[in-house]
Amino acid sequence: MSDGHEPHTDRGAHSTGHEEVAPLAAKVLVSSDGVVAGTREDRSGTALVAALERAGFAVAEHRVVADGVDSVAGALADMASGFDGLVVTTGGTGFGPRDLTPEATRRVVEREAPGLAEAMRLAAPRGLGRLSRGIAGTSGRALIINTPGSPAGAVESLEAVLDVLPHALRLLADEPTSH
């Protein structure tokens, strides 16, 4: 399901000191049986879209799928294919029997980025983030990160790594960096 977000081209451009490069692109994937069934509102996906746009990302897609390995892996593979940017998932990272987003993500990623997942877990207030099983990794030139299903948890997790995401995405795109 798409909510009509089109890529923005008028903000979020990043300067390398000599030239302007395109704004960073992002997609959001919500894993929720309740949202798919219409019994729950998609607050987490909406919160992530807003946080990404505030950070200067052009949000190209916002999709909702049911929990489960096959549905999430299929959507992630589709969203990452040929995409240069960030794919953020929300939901399915806990201990419930259908919380299988990390397992689905492992089917799609080629290289894991454990430092990002560790930073997101450590940033949660009161340490509840330690219960998240979310992972992060790359698929082609897309960086995929899993965040918890609550709006606050999703945004806090994203914000914990926002400062390094532009650099990571430039590295994935094989663009020059200053390191």
Task: Show the residue positions of the predicted features.
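Non-catalytic beta/alpha edge segments that cap or flank active sites
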Residues: 1-179
